[in-house]
Amino acid sequence: MATNNNNNNGNPILRSLETSCCFLATLFPKVFCTLVLTWSLYVLLFIIPNYIKSSLNSTILNIIGITLYVLCIISYYKIILIGPGSPLDYPELRINDLNRMINENPYNNNNNDEEPGDLPPESMIIHTMKVNGNQGYRYCTKCSVWKPDRSHHCSSSGKCILKMDHYCPWFSTCIGFHNYKFFIQFLSYVAIYCWFLFIISGKILYNFITEGLFEDEILSLNLVAVLILSFAFAIAVSVFAMFSIYLCCKNLTTIEFQEKRWNYRGQANDERFNYEFDNNGKRKKINTNIFDLGIMENWKSVMGPNWITWILPITVTVTANTKSMISQDEFNNGVNFKVNEEIYAKYLHNAELQQQLNQQLSSYKDRLRRERQANIV
């Protein structure tokens, strides 16, 4: 991929063609989703009323449909326009000289220099829970920024993403800290809207058959298409919506869910302190998600403090555009996160026990070595 990009940079025609293709690729899902939603609203407003006898019922259905349509459109474009957020948005997280920082990183155990290099912000040093093995705090060599907890580099977006969940081609953007709320709302709105259309069109088709209307009338193909598509989308989107709500209540991202499921990071780094001992001396696993604050607190941390923010697509996070300094909003910026103090205390306790055990084993090995040397003499 890098080779192709280098070749294209030398040829303006290929570079222009590549830019146009990328633009069309990102434009297509936006146009497609907008047209499908608008077409479904057209069917609801201008075709379905022809099969409903009561004008009052038709008006009520139209109001509900328009409301759901507007919510779908607003949440869809808020996902795109607000974006997920990136460490690059915060000047404090930028590394001025990456090579110097790597060579002089005071948090690197292999460092022998006393002169420190670039340091992460103080708030990040205080609150960071995940460190990169023996190499200290995480940083991205491609973006030249410090990587806060739960952030990852997205190859599709070409930059690091705050609390990255996944890259979604239907929006041509990443789902992350700032737009995850709107992603959940969009899935919920679309699922409700699709079930709403399916029930209405299904009832019309049922009456059309049972009342023998097919003998004198022709059923609109648009209505049949809405029936089929709304049912298919309702099932698919409902599954995604429920899964996203589940992850939200667990305070997990899709990446963290997969890492936890497949143990991607490995036993050596993450599993050493994920257990405790009961009164009988048996080992049992503890909750490994240090960001799990409980269902309601997890939900509020993403969806906002009250039911109004839960229902309406209202921004509840603090973006770098409104408050550029991380310290101005300590736990609502995608850089620092609240942790479960009980789980954190268990981690510390188990780490201390592990350290004591290592010291005892080291002392025992030293004693055995001295005894062997004494016996040899």
Curated annotation (Swiss-Prot):
UniProt KW keywords: Acyltransferase, Lipoprotein, Membrane, Palmitate, Transferase, Transmembrane, Transmembrane helix, Vacuole
Record bears the keyword Secreted: no
Post-translational modification: Autopalmitoylated.
Protein name in the entry: Palmitoyltransferase PFA3
Function description: Palmitoyltransferase specific for VAC8. Palmitoylates VAC8 at one or more of its N-terminal cysteine residues, which is required for its proper membrane localization.
Cytoplasmic side of membrane: 1-31, 84-181, 244-377
GO cellular component: endoplasmic reticulum; Golgi apparatus; vacuolar membrane
Catalysis: reaction(s): L-cysteinyl-[protein] + hexadecanoyl-CoA = S-hexadecanoyl-L-cysteinyl-[protein] + CoA
Disulphide bridges, residue numbers: none
Topological category with respect to the lipid bilayer: Multi-pass membrane protein
InterPro entries recorded: Palmitoyltrfase_DHHC (IPR001594), PFA4/ZDH16/20/ERF2-like (IPR039859)
Any Pfam family matching the protein: DHHC
UniProt record, GO biological process: protein targeting to membrane
EC numbers on record: 2.3.1.225
Compartments in which it is found: Vacuole membrane
PANTHER family for this protein: PALMITOYLTRANSFERASE ZDHHC16 (PTHR12246)
Name of encoding gene: PFA3
Residue stretches making up the DHHC domain: 138-188
Record remark on domains: The DHHC domain is required for palmitoyltransferase activity.
The family this protein is said to belong to: Belongs to the DHHC palmitoyltransferase family. PFA3 subfamily.
Lumenal compartment segments: 53-62, 203-222
GO molecular function: protein-cysteine S-palmitoyltransferase activity
Record organism: Candida albicans (strain SC5314 / ATCC MYA-2876) (Yeast)
Active site: C168 (s-palmitoyl cysteine intermediate)
